């Protein structure tokens, strides 16, 4: 019984490692596709009044699809 418990814990740990590795691989692929638009830390605010598609495209902090949700919130 104890050996089955140990085997189950090891199996769960292995599965979690596989999932984490797969997520990291997907993030690397996404970063390569986006080129210079890799994830970066937010260093300054874009005021909500200036949150436009053009401003978001040229911003280091936001991806276009997230801009409307995050402008002015850093």
UniProtKB/Swiss-Prot annotation:
Its main location: secreted. Residues 1-22 form the signal peptide. Changing residue 60 to A: Decrease of KcsA potassium channel blocking activity. One of its GO terms (cellular component) is nematocyst. Residues 42-74 form the ShKT domain. Very weakly blocks potassium channels Kv1.5/KCNA5 (Ki=9.76 uM), Kv7.2/KCNQ2 (Ki=3.81 uM) and the heterotetramer formed by Kv7.2 and Kv7.3 (KCNQ2/KCNQ3) (Ki=6.91 uM). A synonymy between H.magnifica and R.crispa is controversial. Potently blocks the voltage-gated potassium channel Kv1.1/KCNA1 (Ki=75 pM), KcsA (Ki~1 nM) and moderately blocks Kv1.2/KCNA2 (Ki=2.5 nM) and Kv1.3/KCNA3 (Ki=3.1 nM). Also facilitates acetylcholine release at the avian neuromuscular junction. Blockade and dissociation rate are sensitive to voltage. This is Kappa-stichotoxin-Hmg1a.
